[in-house]
């Protein structure tokens, strides 16, 4: 009798477990407006809405044309579903944007160019590419020196946030004097002024975004627009952060020195 009672209890518990799990599974189905298909995975993935237009430094860019729309769609999906990387960049922005924004403003550079720094280095101040670009703005050594940074065996100012930003501003000003268009300036930062100038002349394009370029540069301009969209309204793209989640500014002090530092740990 005792044995039967235990079996009865186990059977009843199993039945209850199944009864409880069915509504949970049904509740996790993904139903679109057109189809009633049950998902085989316990979550839904939906594409972010592509806006009809984007604004970069006051310039309205029409995204309704199919090729622009699809290129923007690609980058929005990339940032939306690169969950950990995008989340980390949003957190880092709280640390670095307050430093960068006044420097851009003081140099007459559009505030939107802070997003270029995001796609260059993921807001990692010690980022270094396989090609040798370094810092938040990913300057190559030759370009860094051209725009006033000291780069040698002892000093590398590409890692100095304020000085590297000032150098980036000098580049932006020079490029804008040539193109008169900030989006062309951003494309040249990736591909080089020589290439963008030659392609603008060769392709007779009215806008840099319409140039047929290498994939990296072609994506670069739309990545710039997409990251602005995501950072401007992270909640809309599923990134829900509290103030305490954001990375704070790092306190520091300046120490003057007149000799080389061979051993930093002993300095």
What are these regions (language model features)?
Residues 131-153, 165-168, 172:
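Substrate-binding/active-site groove segments that recognize
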Residues 37-79, 128, 135-138, 152, ...:
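Catalytic and substrate-binding regions of cell-wall glycan-acting enzymes that process beta-1,4-linked
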Residues 79-90, 102-103, 123-130, 150-161, ...:
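Second-shell loop/turn segments in exported
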Residues 1-107:
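An acidic, Gly/Ser/Thr/Pro-rich helix-cap/linker signature
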Residues 91, 95-98, 102, 114, ...:
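Solvent-exposed, polar/charged alpha-helical surfaces in well-ordered, non-transmembrane soluble domains
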Residues 58, 95, 111-114, 118, ...:
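Extracytoplasmic
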Residues 109-126, 185-190:
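Short, functionally critical alpha-helical segments immediately adjacent to catalytic or ligand/cofactor-binding
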Residues 236-267:
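Low-complexity, Gly/Ser/Thr/Pro-rich intrinsically disordered linker/tail segments
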């Amino acid at each position: 009798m005792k044995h039967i009672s235990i079996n009865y209890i186990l059977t009843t518990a199993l039945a209850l477990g199944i009864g409880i799990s069915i509504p949970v599974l049904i509740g996790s189905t993904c139903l679109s407006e057109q189809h009633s298909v049950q998902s085989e995975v316990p979550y839904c993935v939906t594409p972010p809405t592509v806006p009809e237009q984007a604004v970069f430094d006051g310039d309205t860019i029409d995204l309704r044309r199919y090729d622009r729309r699809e290129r923007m769609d690609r980058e929005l999906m990339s940032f939306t579903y690169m969950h950990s990387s995008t989340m980390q960049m949003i957190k880092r922005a709280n640390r670095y944007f307050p430093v960068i924004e006044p420097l851009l403003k003081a140099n007459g550079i559009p505030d939107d160019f802070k997003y270029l720094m995001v796609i260059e280095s993921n807001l990692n101040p010690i980022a270094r590419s396989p090609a040798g670009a370094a810092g938040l703005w990913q300057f190559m050594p030759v370009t860094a020196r051209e725009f006033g940074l000291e780069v040698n065996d002892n000093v590398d100012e590409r890692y100095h946030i304020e000085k590297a930003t000032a150098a980036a501003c000098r580049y932006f000003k020079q490029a804008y004097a040539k193109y008169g268009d900030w989006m062309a300036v951003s494309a040249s930062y990736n591909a080089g002024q020589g290439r963008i100038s030659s392609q603008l002349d060769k392709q007779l394009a009215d806008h840099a975004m319409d140039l047929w370029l290498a994939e990296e540069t072609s994506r670069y301009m739309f990545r710039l627009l997409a990251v602005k969209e995501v950072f401007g309204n992270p909640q809309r793209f599923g990134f829900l952060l509290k103030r305490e989640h954001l990375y704070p500014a790092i306190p520091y002090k300046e120490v003057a020195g007149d000799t080389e530092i061979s051993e930093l740990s002993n300095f």
